[in-house]
Design a protein with these regions (language model features):
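Acidic two-metal-ion nuclease catalytic site recognized across multiple nuclease folds
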Residues: 1-2, 150-152, 168-181
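Short alpha-helix plus adjacent loop in nuclease-associated cores
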Residues: 128-143
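Active-site catalytic pocket residues across diverse enzymes, especially alpha/beta-hydrolases
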Residues: 114-117, 178-179
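Non-catalytic, well-ordered alpha-helical scaffold segments
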Residues: 86, 107-108, 128-131, 169-172
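Short hydrophobic/aromatic-enriched beta-strand-loop microsegments
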Residues: 120-128
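A structural motif
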Residues: 119, 139-151
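Active-site flanking residues adjacent to catalytic metal/cofactor-binding acidic residues
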Residues: 10, 128, 166
Length: 181
């Protein structure tokens, strides 16, 4: 592991639709949820969500139902993807730390969107898939979703599921269990 004192947790939310992606649109990051876990103490030292204004898609009613994020919220409070990555880099220096996500989606989506927008990929090479690690540590036959892992650990879901800011904090709790069991 690249770092042992703190680990960055990332959970992305992206535009989505019920069924196929509409013509002329593409899945795009609309929230970068972040948490920082002190791996020794288990304390979540930072937790925030960076709202990202989509440039190549719009938030569908299905997406709002899933995430609670509206197009209006992003229009008023979102920043461009480039600004979001700059904020992430300036505030967290993520290339210096091990980072985790729950599943491979966040890693793949972040790399894909950075390539698509011509933005340097901000994360370090050390990535841990907590979904797979938790399944191995807990002795599961196959990985379970974040909600399922929290349930197995008797940890209540905090906040709103499918909000990056809240999911990052919940993933940090699962990661802490993995680190100490």
């Amino acid at each position: 592991m690249k770092t042992t004192d703190k680990i960055i947790i990332i959970d992305l939310e992206a535009t989505c639709w019920q069924g196929d992606v509409p013509k002329g649109q593409q899945n795009e990051i609309i929230e970068i949820g972040l948490a920082v876990l002190d791996s020794q103490t288990g304390v979540i030292t930072k937790n925030q969500g960076i709202l990202v204004k989509p440039q190549r898609s719009t938030v569908s009613p299905f997406c709002t139902e899933l995430t609670t994020i509206t197009q209006d919220l992003l229009d008023k409070n979102g920043v461009s993807f480039e600004e979001a990555i700059e904020q992430l880099t300036d505030e967290y220096q993520p290339d210096l730390y091990t980072w985790v996500s729950y599943g491979q989606y966040d890693l793949n989506m972040l790399k894909k969107q950075c390539r698509s927008f011509g933005v340097p990929y901000p994360m370090g090479d050390e990535h841990i898939n907590v979904k797979v690690w938790f399944a191995e540590k807990f002795g599961l036959q196959k990985p379970t979703g974040m909600n399922g892992a929290l349930h197995l650990l008797n940890i209540p879901l905090e906040g709103t599921h499918h909000r990056g800011v809240d999911d990052a904090k919940n993933i940090a709790k699962i990661l802490d269990w993995c680190l100490h069991n």
